[in-house]
């Protein structure tokens, strides 16, 4: 149990995919201007990653390995992720048109979000058992969503602040991201 808790803390805080691995930077910079968009994207990414991880893990060990088709893992995972994103997009469009509109082009970009594929590949390459795979696949997108939410709240406050003209927009956002990365590096000693 302690090992699973350490894996959860590591995947959420210590090895955060945005701040330490620099994965998922496109939605991080693009969707973080409003809290509502960041929350919607965070929930969508959590859902897609958890389901994609479960499906790809099962496909890999129940289909690809027995048929000795392990070399097909990448293309199989990409197809699974693309299908899940399409289903998620259709669901959000039907249930929350405002969220769908606010996410814009970033929702279909979850298909190419390297965080999703990274989680699926790390589960296989690290030979995680089912419990480890589940914890890592929940922790990583939760860390993504946490950082996205914190960053969006800071960016909303920055919109109300006086920022020098040279730093308005993305420059100040990148400075804030660097400070956040430094702050999150303090969690390294926990595990």
Where are these regions (language model features)?
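Juxtamembrane boundary at the C-terminal end of a transmembrane helix
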Residues: 1-3, 182-191
């Amino acid at each position: 149990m302690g090992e699973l808790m350490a894996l959860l803390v590591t995947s959420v805080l210590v090895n955060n995919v945005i701040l330490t691995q620099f994965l998922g930077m496109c939605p991080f910079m693009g969707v973080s201007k409003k809290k509502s968009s960041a929350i919607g994207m965070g929930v969508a990414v959590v859902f897609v990653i958890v389901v994609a991880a479960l499906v790809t893990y099962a496909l890999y060990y129940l289909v690809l390995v027995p048929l000795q088709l392990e070399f097909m893992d990448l293309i199989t995972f990409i197809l699974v992720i693309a299908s899940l994103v399409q289903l998620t997009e259709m669901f959000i469009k039907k249930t929350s048109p405002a969220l769908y509109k606010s996410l814009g082009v970033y929702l279909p970009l979850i298909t190419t979000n390297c965080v999703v594929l990274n989680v699926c590949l790390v589960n296989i390459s690290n030979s995680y058992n089912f419990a480890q795979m589940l914890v890592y696949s929940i922790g990583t997108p939760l860390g993504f969503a946490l950082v996205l939410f914190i960053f969006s709240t800071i960016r909303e406050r920055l919109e109300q602040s006086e920022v020098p003209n040279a730093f308005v927009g993305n420059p100040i956002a990148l400075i804030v991201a660097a400070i956040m990365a430094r702050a999150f590096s303090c969690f390294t000693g926990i595990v």
